Amino acid sequence: MLVVSSAARAQVVDRRFAEEPTDGLALPATPIAGEFDSRSATLNSAGLAYMNGPELAVAMELEDDQYATSGGTGLGIYAASDLFGGILPKVGVGLGLEWLRPPRSQLAPDPGEPFRLTVSHANAIGKHLSLGLGFHYFLNGGPLDGLITFDLGLAIRANNYFALGANLKDLDTRDVAGTPVQRRYELEALVRPLGTDQLELSAGGRIGETRGDLDAWGRVMVKALTGMYVVGAIESRALHEIDDSPMGSTDHDTREARVTLGLEISLGSTGIAAYVTGQRGPDHTNHLLGSTYLAKVSATPPPALIPTPDHIERVELSGDLELRALTQIVVRLRSIAQDPTVKGVVVVFDGATGGWATLQEIRAELLAVKAAHKKVFAYMVSGTGRDYFVASAADQIYLDPAGGLRLVGMAGTSFYFKGAFDMIGVTPQFEKIGEYKSAPEMFTEAGPTPIAARMHEELFDSLWQQWLSTVASARHLTPAELQAIVDAGPYTAGELAQNQKLVDGVASPDKVAQLIMTQLGGVYPVGAPADRRSDRWDHPAVAVIYVDGDITDGQSKSLPIIGQKLAGGETVVQSISAAREDPTIGAIVLRIDSPGGSALASELIAREVFATRGVKPVLCSMSNLAASGGYFAAAGCDVIFAEPMTITGSIGIFFGKFDLSGLIHKLGVAIDIFKRGKRADSDSMFRAYTDEERVALLDKLRYSYGRFVAAVAEGRGMTKDAVDAVGRGHVYSGDQARPLRLVDRFGGLNDALDEARKRLHLPVTAQLDLREYPKLGTSLLGVVGKLLTVDQPELPLTELPVVKELVRGVPPSLLVEPDAAQMRLPYVLELAN
């Protein structure tokens, strides 16, 4: 009888568990440190700043009510993305909407079946730290209706091997059905032993502020195959059990263990995952507790389990191919060469403008694509000699029937203003070192001096012979045959359709597509592959520092009237110093496209380069121009890369002024000068130099030239006499400069980056984090202003072609700093096609 009575009492015991009713879906085996996705909107808001593009996810959590000890079941939708970055701080935003359907009879207090709306925000603080705030709002009736709670999140990615995540849950505690909600503190540490997502190990814990209940967990993730991850997790959870019976209520603390196994698969932009969770309950029996299912669409997913289909890439060359744009193009072409899914590349020419070395660099990268056994096709509507130079690297060249090919040769223009100055009574007075430094001749002479003319002719011969031999070889012509073809140009598409020496076909775009597919032997989609998440958080960093335009004192700026950039010495020096002092940057590439300019600014840049040499690799990649002060800046680099058509050298200096006294006299203006000091007005533009002053000026130029020569000698491992012999203002093409030891190797930016990889002991295919300097300084107000401004259709006087060309004929560094000693190319080089 006693036994039966005891059994009867046991049968009416109602067991419940005191759990925090504000939790969302359980989402087992989802980390709060390391890699983050849209689920971070509810799990650790700080992780949103580490996302790469938008993502949308749907999750469903199922549990067996018979064995459930907590909430966390239901359906959830999550959306998140990172924003900004670059000139603006990187942030992350996330949304979550969860329909919670917990085992109500198992929980105390009864949470009902609420909807939980989450809005989260994260701010990146530097590259390795992020802070987040999550806002939760409950609705749909029940004890949680209208409740608002907040979470604080922290995420740290120290490096490729270690990450940390932390949460403060329910910052603003409230009562739910008379039961206070306690704050909870979560911490998780994650280790990647191999530095990649091949293997992840993590451990974490959670403690309640009021009851002191402690949960602990561990997690392992292994990349079984590309696009397939196996996940395992074990968790020990503290439970507060409440037993209600006719004899009254009792409560006590107990524990349970949960084990989760999961499989995550990337199918490209779509990902799916499934997890199953087993439980060893407080009664020490084992049960299958439940399962979780996840589907998501991501802009930057992991590489797919199913290989990306073969495709064709389309590369458009249009607009101004300035240095930063060129970086994107050549890096992309190198990536295409290494991508096994690319079957071919179609290069579309649409009015691109760039110097010959720029075009030569792009052409070299197209040849690298061909060397990787991929077809290259060129298509143009109305091509120029510049376009054709690049297009000649292609396997097939196609021309639109409505267009033509303006193949007429190469021309350059130099301006000489002496006649105009004589007419108005202006006397240019300049001193220079040495005899090839012909920059002042545009002011002092009516035409080139014989030595300058010879130098110009030799330079043009070098450039033209390179164009001629390169294109002739590509089109299986002799240079003489190609010269005759050029001399008979330009050509219409109709003329070229009858003669396939220059093009392989004249066809409309749809017909060209058919021809390309025939050449490839199949039909392939055109377009770049989707972005893929990297297998590591950090990549070796290399700083790319641009010296773009005339070198001037102070900060970098631009002259929009003539469309010229000025490389401020102070800006470049600060960039080099910042890159040198940044411990995360392994090497520096100085990317130069400059004719020189201010002697002082050029030397300050060179000094900073020498200060960096030996601290970390510092390499130079010359683009179209790296002459005079531009060469001074490069002299201290460990290795100098240039294209054969780069224009460099011009090791020399000049200084002077314009005597306006004749003009002033013609205008009937009288000038009275007061001075204390014999040479107080020596730089005045209202009188000429005395003979004594010109001698003193030349002595100062000799001193500066000596410093220039000494720097080149030190940097290039040459004697000063050897540098002087190839200096004295002489301008060279890269092809001429290499035998003179002014250039080490032919190549472009990618070749310099390969050298950086070598010096950092990295594989040649290692992905790099390119840090571009100087940072583009645009204020938020300026960005908003550009978005809201409507351009007015007006053409200022300075935009008239004739006026613009005349103004461009004057070196920009002289326009800005007429009173500074100049280390600059002898002319404004404009090479027509």
List each model region and its residues.
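N-terminal, post-signal peptide beta-strand-biased segments of exported outer-membrane/organellar beta-barrel
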Residues: 8-90, 172
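Residues that define the transmembrane beta-barrel architecture of outer-membrane proteins
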Residues: 39-41, 69-75, 111-117, 146-150, ...
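Residues on the lipid-exposed face of transmembrane beta-strands in outer-membrane beta-barrel proteins
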Residues: 44, 58, 75-83, 119-123, ...
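Repeated loop/turn-to-beta-strand initiation elements of outer-membrane beta-barrel proteins
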Residues: 54-58, 84-95, 126-133, 160-166, ...
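Transmembrane beta-strands of outer-membrane beta-barrel pores
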Residues: 60-66, 97-103, 135-141, 168-175, ...
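Detector for outer-membrane/organellar transmembrane beta-barrel domains
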Residues: 146-240
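Intrinsically disordered, low-complexity segments enriched in small/flexible residues
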Residues: 244-261, 266-339, 344, 411-494, ...
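Cleft-lining beta-strand/loop regions that shape enzyme active-site pockets
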Residues: 300-415, 538-663
